[in-house]
């Protein structure tokens, strides 16, 4: 079961990735984690990646694909894997295909931008414990105070509206074209494509995923 998750930041991919990993026992493959692990291990690919990153450059698609290929041969990927945040662009998707990495399911989480902004901008965090609240969907008992310690809650820099809207613009420019790319792949019989309404309750989306994935 090889799965790609698509959807804007804040569309609920992370929550559902957790559900899929726990239910089906497959690992989530993050290219960022892979790069860090390869650099730490000092593998040939890791040394190449380190050289590029130390020079302040972006790691090439070829190198990332090579890392993905290496990663999916490991034992924990025997029953499949989950890719979130990769591929981000059509050249990356093409490179994956050319490398012979087959994808069984592409799952798109669809949520309107304004709702994503509301979801993210309303987050409040208790930095010391990592507890997360939301002014509308999961408010603290006392406004802007942590329920347990009574300490102040803060807004993460990444959760500010201007930052969120900028990330959404980048997503629509760069990653959204993958939607039509993978729809065509599904039409050609190379994968299965499903679009999920991410505005629903978490449990409802999870139930639909369980039906799709079996």
Swiss-Prot record:
It comes from Yersinia enterocolitica serotype O:8 / biotype 1B (strain NCTC 13174 / 8081). InterPro entries: Adenyl_kin_sub, Adenylat/UMP-CMP_kin, Adenylat_kinase_CS, Adenylate_kinase_lid-dom, P-loop_NTPase. This is Adenylate kinase. ATP binds at residues 10-15, 123, 132-133, 200. It is an enzyme of class 2 (transferase). PANTHER family: NUCLEOTIDE KINASE. One of its GO terms (molecular function) is ATP binding. Gene3D superfamilies: P-loop containing nucleotide triphosphate hydrolases (3.40.50.300). Pfam families: ADK (PF00406), ADK_lid (PF05191). Residues 30-59 are annotated as: NMP. It catalyses: AMP + ATP = 2 ADP. Its main location: cytoplasm. SUPFAM superfamilies: P-loop containing nucleoside triphosphate hydrolases (SSF52540). One of its GO terms (cellular component) is cytoplasm. AMP binds at residues 31, 36, 57-59, 85-88, 92, 156, 167. Catalyzes the reversible transfer of the terminal phosphate group between ATP and AMP. Plays an important role in cellular energy homeostasis and in adenine nucleotide metabolism. Consists of three domains, a large central CORE domain and two small peripheral domains, NMPbind and LID, which undergo movements during catalysis. The LID domain closes over the site of phosphoryl transfer upon ATP binding. Assembling and dissambling the active center during each catalytic cycle provides an effective means to prevent ATP hydrolysis. Keywords: ATP-binding, Cytoplasm, Kinase, Nucleotide biosynthesis, Nucleotide-binding, Transferase. GO terms for biological process: AMP salvage. Its EC number is 2.7.4.3. It is found in: Cytoplasm. Residues 122-159 are annotated as: LID. Belongs to the adenylate kinase family. Pathway: Purine metabolism; AMP biosynthesis via salvage pathway; AMP from ADP: step 1/1.
